[in-house]
Every structure is written in C-alpha cells, then in structure tokens.
C-alpha cells in the first residue's frame, strides 16, 4: 500500500481543516503508518499493514505516571491526560471527552477510506490482468 494514494482518499472524509495528515514509516518493523494531527496535536497513528489492521495508537506530546491507573499514560504539554487504549480498539476516557469522540470518528472515517482504497487496488489489479 502506498501512503500517498491512501492519504488522497482520506482527504475526502477529512473535511475539517483542523486535521492534518503526515506520512511516516515505522523504523522498527518497516510498516507504513499515517499520523493524524488535530490543531497541531498528534492524536492518532494508523497502520496501513493488513496484519495490523487494528493498530490505532494515541500519539501524545509526552507521557506521565497516573496514580489513578497505576501506569504511564499519554498526556498533553500541560500534563492533562488524553486517554488510554485497551487492546488497540477501545479508548477509555480520562478527561477529554470531545477529543475522544473526535478520535473515534477519525477511526471510522479511516476505515471507510481504507475500504475504498482496497476496492481501487482490486479494480486496478483486475484491469492489469485483462
């Protein structure tokens, strides 16, 4: 999968100018991921690899220890917690309801864009064979 083509499809679903996307490649395993920012805050990283379809990760400015949860969690520059992920699929609110809703709606939009992208790939493969 090429991030540039996927990003182009995503733009149809990301109509709010507050959102920006940036392509990055994970050095650790070579998988391609797209980072999504909301007003400059990194809020979501989505992995394009088939075997990691549910790899949604919260990106934070920094991390700090939460006494309430007994673990290190992502937070903003002012120290307020953004949220925590459980099994990469459920986001638990720690205090930023509107941001949580935005992130969850982003995930749905990305899923729609990914289905469209896969459809285009299949159509292209079919044309190449014919």
Spans of model-derived segments:
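Negatively charged, low-complexity tracts enriched in Asp/Glu with abundant Ser/Thr
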Residues: 1-35
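Ampiphathic alpha-helical segments that act as solvent-exposed interaction surfaces
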Residues: 3-16, 75-120
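Intrinsically disordered, low-complexity regulatory segments enriched in Ser/Thr/Pro
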Residues: 33-101
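Short intrinsically disordered terminal tails
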Residues: 1, 119-130
């Amino acid at each position: 999968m090429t991030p540039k083509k996927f990003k182009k499809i995503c733009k149809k679903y990301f109509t709010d100018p507050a959102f920006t996307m940036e392509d990055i490649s994970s050095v650790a395993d070579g998988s391609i991921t797209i980072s999504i920012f909301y007003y400059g805050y990194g809020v979501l990283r989505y992995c394009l690899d088939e075997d990691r379809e549910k790899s949604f990760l919260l990106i934070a400015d920094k991390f700090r220890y939460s006494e309430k949860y007994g673990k290190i969690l992502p937070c903003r520059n002012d120290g307020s917690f953004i949220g925590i992920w459980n099994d990469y699929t459920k986001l638990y609110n720690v205090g930023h309801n509107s941001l949580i809703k935005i992130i969850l709606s982003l995930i749905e939009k990305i899923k729609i864009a990914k289905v469209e992208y896969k459809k285009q790939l299949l159509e292209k493969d079919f044309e190449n064979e014919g």
